[in-house]
Amino acid sequence: MQPSIPGTRGSKNSVAQRALTTGSSSSGEGLMRSTLEPSAPSCCESASLREVTSAAGPIAPARSEPPSRLCENGPVEASNFALTDVQRQFRDTLRQYAEERIAPQAAEVDRTAEFPWKSFKACVELELPALGIPEAYGGAGADMVTQAIMAEELARVCASTSLTMLISKLGMLPVMNWGSDELRRHYLPKVAAGEMQASYCLSEADAGSDVAAMKSRAVRDGDDYILTGSKYWITNAGISDVYVVFAKTDPVAGGRGITCFLVERDWGITVAKHEDKMGLRGSPTGEVTLNEVRVPASHRIGAEGQGFTIAMHTLDRSRPTIGAQAVGIAQGAIDYSASYMKQRHAFGGPIADLQGLRFMLADMAMRTEAARALVYRACAMVDDDPSDELTLFGAMAKAFASDTAMSVTVDAVQLLGGYGYTRDFPVERFLRDAKVTQIYEGTNQVQKVVIAREILKHA
């Protein structure tokens, strides 16, 4: 019986049958695909997730499930106790699917720096873009922990593909939480179906962390607004069909003068340039320019002057999934390193027998597991109609998980020695991809400012 992804309205899309070999390989990327297959029976042989959902109840935040045995899929990953049966089934299904349909393209996507259309279409086949969209608007309405699992499992094999799923959700969050019902009904079903992609245009060349310093303008003209300005570091620039753009309707009011708009690409948005990035090379990042673009007033999100509040509200709810992406990158590096250590021989045996290297692997796993727990806690808070605590825990989850991903991938390169420094093996890609998780959606230095402020506020 073929499984379907939970919360996707009974989709009958099947996961590809297990087709990967399990022997050793001289190719680093081949080694990754062969040695990281689950040791448990193929999820393709299990009952459908629709049946599992009926038996176990609907997908729910992780905290609602009592503890079960640890390390279900092996000794490296130990947070299964926090997941419901449905969430574990979803994770296992998506893990195999990602290894079979996403991982084979990951190195080429990184090398060519081209958008991973093949991987994106594979995600659409499983209706993954629908995961974070409410059911009332054609989505799956999945809880945030399940969305974090998606980000993690995709990032475990290809962080660029993971970001393609996260960015449209980020772009649609202002519409979901602040937009009119007309905007929701027009755009959300198309994003959920993978027919549209969305971008989030907040940063500018001289207004990254200091959002209130933005210079983009929006001037009312009858039933329209005229938008002018440039936005930098825009994920999916040129690929997305719609862009959430923040601009000042009152240039002297600082942050209180910012307003949010939903702008279609064909209305006059242009991409001035794409960046040649260190990592996440399959996810285009560019400068988006608006030169007197006319936007209907009906496409304003929220009221005039609410833009700063909308931006911060959105990032609070998105940062935990950036933490999940970072955890996925770290987990991919751990899994690859562990497999490599068992196959690589030196001093008369596998290097996995060397205590010093075992200690490194243990530290990597401990840090990653702690990050995962913090990410899941922050994600559960999103589902709890959160108070100020989400700002604190969202910042903590993002900062801690991204620092963890960076330290773990550095150690993974070290464990592979000279091989880790070459592009024949994936750990250097993991390292390059991990770096940006410390930067985007608020640098970790800014996150620490937020964390300290929130702690002192309640002291």
Where are these regions (language model features)?
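Intrinsically disordered, low-complexity segments enriched in small polar residues
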Residues: S4-S14, T21-G30, S34, S39-S42, ...
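Alpha-helical interface subdomain recognition
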Residues: G23-G28, A40-C43, E65, R69-T161, ...
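Short glycine/proline-enriched turns and hinge-like loops at secondary-structure junctions
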Residues: A142-D143, D210-A212, N236-S240, G254-G257, ...
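Short Gly/Pro-enriched turn/cap motifs at secondary-structure boundaries
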Residues: V191, D206-S209, W233-N236, D250-V252, ...
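A short, Trp-centered hydrophobic/proline-enriched beta-strand micro-motif
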Residues: G194-L202
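Conserved hydrophobic/aromatic beta-strand scaffold that supports enzyme active sites
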Residues: S199, A213-R217, D224, V242-F246, ...
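Flexible, small-/acidic-enriched active-site or ligand-binding loops
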Residues: A213, G268-P296
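A short core secondary-structure module
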Residues: D223-D224, T228-V271
